[in-house]
Swiss-Prot record:
A Gene Ontology BP annotation from the UniProt entry: cell wall organization
GO MF, one example: peptidoglycan lytic transglycosylase activity
Name by which UniProt lists this protein: Membrane-bound lytic murein transglycosylase F
Catalytic activity: Exolytic cleavage of the (1->4)-beta-glycosidic linkage between N-acetylmuramic acid (MurNAc) and N-acetylglucosamine (GlcNAc) residues in peptidoglycan, from either the reducing or the non-reducing ends of the peptidoglycan chains, with concomitant formation of a 1,6-anhydrobond in the MurNAc residue
Location within or outside the cell: Cell outer membrane
Active site: E318
GO cellular component assignments: cell outer membrane
UniProt-annotated stretches for the region LT domain: 273-467
Chain's gene name: mltF
Record remark: domains: The N-terminal domain does not have lytic activity and probably modulates enzymatic activity. The C-terminal domain is the catalytic active domain.
Organism: Sulfurimonas denitrificans (strain ATCC 33889 / DSM 1251)
Location of region: Non-LT domain: 16-271
PANTHER family for this protein: MEMBRANE-BOUND LYTIC MUREIN TRANSGLYCOSYLASE F (PTHR35936:SF32)
Keywords (A to Z) from UniProt: Cell outer membrane, Cell wall biogenesis/degradation, Lyase, Membrane, Signal
Family membership noted in the UniProt record: In the N-terminal section; belongs to the bacterial solute-binding protein 3 family.
Lineage, uppermost ranks: Bacteria, Pseudomonadati, Campylobacterota, Epsilonproteobacteria, Campylobacterales
Length: 467
């Protein structure tokens, strides 16, 4: 072969190789960038959601949570349905995000330098700052911390693989003496509960998580902010450029339309923040508010065979007998009905006192009838009230758990021991309906019975008969 032919062959060979490599790279990029098209074609957006109040949980009338609602909005924008995989801890959520079939991971995740090295974050949708919360008894013994220096000697526990553990490690490098423990066993909410019961002294949580939980734990106190405000974002599947670009565009629309502001107000702006045990105010409202609605309560009580004092007490627990009451979750009226529940009950105007009272009575009647037949007497009403608060599914889960623990699943005395366990990962991860604020349901029923007792003692009702 002549030299010229050899040279030409070599050039052709390398040119062909370069073109093949370039075409392969372009094709590879097209495949990687087609995640958005694949989602639309399959009709499903596969997401990981942290099972927590700030993110996703099953409420009394279905799925709830700020990030769940936001993802549902994005799925609607794409014209697909959400396919949800739940995680019980942030560490578990991060592990699940590595599954190539998962498109988005949502777990109130703070964008940190360390995380951005490993994960592909989408656009930011929320800001929060980390806060140290401690048991209030530390105020009494002079050990309550005011800054990172004063954490020395305290029992501080935070979640493993969280931004909180990164914050502590960063502070240690700066010379702060913080003897913190990192755990993958407990969720953030479980650690808050441990602070409340003083199993540990302090933990670190995001400001939005503190806002959601401070109402339920009377012994936790905000100590100080331990970080500046930082951005939170979803983790996207790798090389999802088209998905990320579409998300930026959608998020801009959500912000401009006011939908984001409405969602934040829905979950984090507390229009009602009641002191449920303010008996002095309760006595006052028996005289000033109850008479306006007394006839409606009595008529509904007769129609649905529900004790009048229990129905009136339920309404006070829900709204303080304020017909215009609106809660952070969007429920409203004297009986605090959701829009979906109101529609199901035939209630057209939730702030109309008569409609709300009869709708709430009908809803409670449905709960009573849905409680297992083996639950009898006074307990039947208590089970129904718990279901009114947290949902029938979670009450059924608690009964199943009670049975597993060798307790009487049809006894309120035993069920109230089990309901708080629905917020503990080792229990709720095995149950059909997942995480629930079972402790809140117990307090809810107890409060209603406190009010009911006061009403009865004031001769509002001479005797109580149960269905």
């Amino acid at each position: 072969m002549k030299r010229g032919s050899v040279a030409l062959f070599a050039i052709s060979f390398f040119a062909f190789g370069w073109m093949t490599h370039a075409l392969y790279n372009d094709a590879y990029k097209m495949i990687k960038e087609s995640t958005l098209k694949k989602i639309k074609k399959s009709g499903a957006l596969n997401v990981v959601l942290l099972n927590a109040p700030s993110t996703y949980y099953i409420g009394s009338d279905g799925p709830k949570g700020f990030e769940y609602d936001l993802l549902e909005s994005y799925a609607n924008h794409l014209g697909v349905k959400l396919n949800i995989t739940t995680a019980n801890t942030i560490k578990e959520a991060l592990e699940l995000s590595k599954n190539p079939d998962i498109h988005i991971t949502s777990a109130s995740l703070t964008k940190t330098p360390e995380r951005e090295k490993e994960f592909n974050f989408g656009p930011s949708y929320f800001e929060a700052q980390e806060q140290v919360v401690c048991n209030k008894s530390l105020l009494l013994d002079g050990r309550f911390p005011s800054d990172a220096d004063s954490l020395s000697g305290l029992r501080v526990v935070v979640g493993d693989s969280t931004s909180y553990s990164e914050t502590i490690e960063s502070l240690k490098k700066e010379g702060f003496d913080i003897n913190a423990t990192y755990t993958a066993e407990y969720s953030t909410e479980e650690l808050i509960s441990q602070v409340d019961t003083h199993e540990i002294d302090c933990t670190i949580i995001d400001s939005n998580i503190y806002a959601l939980n401070q109402r339920y734990f009377k012994n936790i106190v905000l100590a100080f902010d331990i970080s500046n405000r930082r951005q939170q974002a979803w983790i996207l599947t790798p090389d999802s450029k088209m998905l990320k670009n579409d998300m930026y565009s959608w998020l801009n629309t959500v912000n401009q339309s006011g939908e984001m502001a409405r969602l934040k107000d829905h979950y984090y702006s507390y229009v009602l923040f009641f002191d449920y045990y303010d008996t002095v105010m309760f006595y006052k409202r028996i005289k000033t508010r109850l008479p306006k609605y007394e006839s409606y309560f009595k008529e509904a009580a007769v129609k649905y065979e529900i004790p009048y004092s229990a129905l009136a007490a339920l309404s006070y627990q829900e709204s303080h007998w304020n017909p215009n009451a609106v809660s952070y979750t969007g429920v409203r009226g004297l009986m605090m009905l959701t829009q979906d529940t109101a529609s199901m009950l035939g209630v057209k105007n939730r702030i109309d006192p008569q409609e709300s009272i009869f709708g709430g009575a009908k809803h409670l009647d449905q709960m009573i009838k849905s409680v297992h037949a083996d639950v009898t007497g006074e307990d039947r009403l208590k089970f129904a009230l718990a279901a009114y608060n947290v949902g029938l599914g979670h009450v059924a889960d608690a009964q199943k758990l009670a049975q597993q623990l060798g307790l009487n699943q049809n006894s309120w005395a035993d069920l109230k021991k089990v309901l708080p366990m629905l917020s503990q990962k080792k229990y709720y991860r095995t149950l059909k309906h997942g995480y629930a604020r079972g402790n809140e349901a117990v307090k809810y029923v107890d409060a209603i019975y406190d009010y009911r007792d006061i009403l009865q003692k004031n001769d509002v009702e001479v005797s109580l008969t149960t269905k």
